[in-house]
Amino acid sequence: MKTFSAKPKEVRRDWYLVDANGVTLGRLASEIARRLRGKHKAIYTPHIDTGDYIVVVNAEKIRATGKKMAQKHYYRHSGYPGGIKSLTLEKLLERAPERAIELAVKGMLPKNPLGRAMFRKLNVYGGSNHPHIAQQPQPLKI
């Protein structure tokens, strides 16, 4: 018996709608990353993008355990000496609630062109409205 390898044109992609209201950030991100990679499918092939599309709503209502809202920092650097900036999770959720989920999921995907292709299938929205109604996303409970 030969080992099965999925072909890119044969992969069927579904759309899922995830409500992030009251869900812990890390648990949400790990399940989303698993679905984006396609590891939940029997046809999973490591070098082929077999994942599904994910739409996340209510990103502003995620939870963090412990004191992470005040103590978890996100860093960026301008490239100039002394140009390091930091932002707490609390401030990040005020400014751009989608970004917290995007950063958590991006860190759990491969750091290569295939991982970037997987990340493009993620759509995160701060509120409860989204423009993907035509795709008829199925609700996914996490």
Swiss-Prot record:
Molecular-function GO terms, alphabetical: mRNA binding; structural constituent of ribosome
Disulphides: none
Keywords for this protein: Ribonucleoprotein, Ribosomal protein
GO CC annotation terms, alphabetical: cytosolic large ribosomal subunit
Stored InterPro entries: Ribosomal_uL13, Ribosomal_uL13_bac-type, Ribosomal_uL13_CS, Ribosomal_uL13_sf
CDD domains per UniProt: Ribosomal_L13
One record GO biological process: translation
Family: Belongs to the universal ribosomal protein uL13 family.
HAMAP family attached to this UniProt entry: Ribosomal_uL13
Entry function: This protein is one of the early assembly proteins of the 50S ribosomal subunit, although it is not seen to bind rRNA by itself. It is important during the early stages of 50S assembly.
Record note on quaternary structure: Part of the 50S ribosomal subunit.
Protein name listed in UniProt: Large ribosomal subunit protein uL13
